[in-house]
């Protein structure tokens, strides 16, 4: 059994370089919700050095709210914004001897694309037109994953180790009770359930089936780094190989 571990980097948490020793995929902020040219370059350089798969982490242009405020924009604006951010990170990756392998939207853009077909199609179109070989990271069972596959893109279904789920498979909004799980032992158990059993317990009590292909580890918080290491260690102890999505695909094609 195999799984990818990913983390969102370049967002000013200060643990980026150390996190890259634990994850197999890095989603690098492209400057619109956090980060900037120097942070992007640092993260790309470290990822190249450590052999971690590089991904773009585009968002709405919303640094004031860390990209977490929902926006209703024309599809053309979303398309252009995603293209702009992909181009910036791709240029830096090329200069550092790497390349973008995947795209994972951030924050409100991620959540809206997960449920809104128009937003999902705008993001998917930008990715496809930029480079149809790129994989897409999206919420497991979401509209966004379906849109990516319909467009012929490789879609990697993502689960979250420390987030609450609703019965429909969506994440509990951060403004609501149960959105974040603080108990580390509970998070470890949930992660193993999602990876090995392909299911997660919703806040309402139901089991929700999902296809976990990559697990997001958060790097913010005083104990985040140590806890990320605990999750990786627990997965490996359970016989789960931690590998990047490209390796997963290669194994499936073999």
From Swiss-Prot:
Keywords: ATP-binding, Hydrolase, Nucleotide-binding. The keyword 4Fe-4S does not apply. GO terms for molecular function: 5-oxoprolinase (ATP-hydrolyzing) activity; ATP binding. Belongs to the LamB/PxpA family. Its EC number is 3.5.2.9. CDD domains: LamB_YcsF_YbgL_like. This is 5-oxoprolinase subunit A. It comes from Burkholderia ambifaria (strain MC40-6). Forms a complex composed of PxpA, PxpB and PxpC. It holds the Pfam family LamB_YcsF. InterPro entries: Glyco_hydro/deAcase_b/a-brl (IPR011330), LamB/YcsF/PxpA-like (IPR005501). Catalyzes the cleavage of 5-oxoproline to form L-glutamate coupled to the hydrolysis of ATP to ADP and inorganic phosphate. HAMAP family: PxpA. GO terms for biological process: carbohydrate metabolic process. Signal peptide: none annotated. It comes from the Bacteria. The keyword Aminoacyl-tRNA synthetase does not apply. It catalyses: 5-oxo-L-proline + ATP + 2 H2O = L-glutamate + ADP + phosphate + H(+).
């Amino acid at each position: 059994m195999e799984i990818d571990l990913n983390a969102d980097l370049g967002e000013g948490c200060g643990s980026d370089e150390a996190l890259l020793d634990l994850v197999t995929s890095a989603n690098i902020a492209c400057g619109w919700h956090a980060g900037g040219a120097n942070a992007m370059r640092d993260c790309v350089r470290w990822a190249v050095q450590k052999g971690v798969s590089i991904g773009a982490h585009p968002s709405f242009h919303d640094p004031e709210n860390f990209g977490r405020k929902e926006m209703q924009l024309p599809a053309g604006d979303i398309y252009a914004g995603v293209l702009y951010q992909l181009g910036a990170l791709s240029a830096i990756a090329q200069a550092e001897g790497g390349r973008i392998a995947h795209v994972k939207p951030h924050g409100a853009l991620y959540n809206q694309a997960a449920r809104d077909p128009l937003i999902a199609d705008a993001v998917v179109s930008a990715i496809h037109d930029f480079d149809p070989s790129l994989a897409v990271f999206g919420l497991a069972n979401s509209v966004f994953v379906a849109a990516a596959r319909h467009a012929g893109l490789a879609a990697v279904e993502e689960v979250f180790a420390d987030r609450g789920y609703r019965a429909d498979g969506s994440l509990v909004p951060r403004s609501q009770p149960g959105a974040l799980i603080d108990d580390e032992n509970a998070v470890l158990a949930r992660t193993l359930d999602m990876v090995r059993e392909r299911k997660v317990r919703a806040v309402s009590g139901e089991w929700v089936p999902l296809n976990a292909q990559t697990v997001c580890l958060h790097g913010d918080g005083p104990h985040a780094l140590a806890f990320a290491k605990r999750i990786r260690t627990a997965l490996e102890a359970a016989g789960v190989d931690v590998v990047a999505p490209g390796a997963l695909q290669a194994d499936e094609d073999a």
